[in-house]
Amino acid sequence: MSRPVVVFEYGSGNVHSAVKALEAAGADVELTRDRRRAQEADGLVVPGVGAFAAVVDRLRAAHGDEIIERRLAGGRPVLGICVGMQVMFERGTEHGQETAGLGEWPGAVEPLCAGVVPHVGWNAVEAPADSVLFDGVWDERFYFVHSYAAQHWTLEATGPFPKPRVSWAEHGSRFVAAVENGPLSATQFHPEKSGSAGLRLLANWIGSL
């Protein structure tokens, strides 16, 4: 049976490709900003494109920060995509301006240290051997479009959850490509634009709900 998944519609970018990919991966998908529906779904997907500060502002205006916090407190899965991953960190720095994120993870999102920015294209991802998301797609490449990333990871095991599984990619220097941390997972790349590998990754997440 399909698992009910909400893609949170809060005004950040084109979410329809995420909806279609999640449906193709086996989810029963609803696109909504309704707080009750977002809270009750088996899984919540938080996409995001554009500037860190603008995404944070839109999320908060739609009470997305409260929804995410309540879901995580109850152990209910959340998946962030691209800037939807970035805003889970404590802060983001763009054009010299620092903006507070949602603070689910310590650390900062900063400009990529690369000669060519933005980073647009397909990259390999170095995932831990016990990753659930990357099961079956260890050697695949995923599609990235970004100029900023978290380039350090400091969080270890917290509370009842095991040590986070952190995956890495490289563009100029290493950066965090994906995180699996209890009920909160996220990808810097776009699984919905990553072909069959992205669909398998989404199916792995759906299967874990």
From Swiss-Prot:
GO BP, sorted A to Z: L-histidine biosynthetic process
Main location: cytoplasm
Pfam families reported for this sequence: GATase (PF00117)
CDD domains linked to this entry: GATase1_IGP_Synthase
Catalytic residues, chain numbering: C82 (nucleophile), H190, E192
PANTHER family registered for this protein in UniProt: IMIDAZOLE GLYCEROL PHOSPHATE SYNTHASE SUBUNIT HISH
Protein name: Imidazole glycerol phosphate synthase subunit HisH
